[in-house]
């Protein structure tokens, strides 16, 4: 099974060693890997905190100091009150996002590298990512997670995070899968056909609901 790279694990542990990291959790593809829910490699790490509970600016300042102490190079790509993006170059290269996001709806899970969203919350948030942007990796992640938890549980988890999730709009987003070629979907080619049928059927069910 694919895991976080050694450098990614090092970065995550460094971040969670900071006092200002309290209240942040690992999210996204990195959390899926850390939780053993995905084999799709990721090129970035996302750390999310709840509104009013964390400070992106304070965490960023401490994080950049810690990066410098490791003698790694970095470039601050973006910085606002609720979001920051840093490119870090050490033994490898990595993009790290610090962001304010919706508070967790499920108990936080603990992994050897630090706190992450619970598996079902990760699944719900991935479905919301598909709803918002529908990138190739979102289809693959939702496919894998929905096979594990079931469509209804994943949808219900997503609605606990975002109550306004609309079934018909979600169906339309699922139908945009056709804009990606088979080679653009980060999954074994033997599963691409099944994945396409899976979303076609799910979109049909949602559209008729």
Language-model features: locations:
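Compositionally biased terminal segments of proteins
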Residues: 1-209
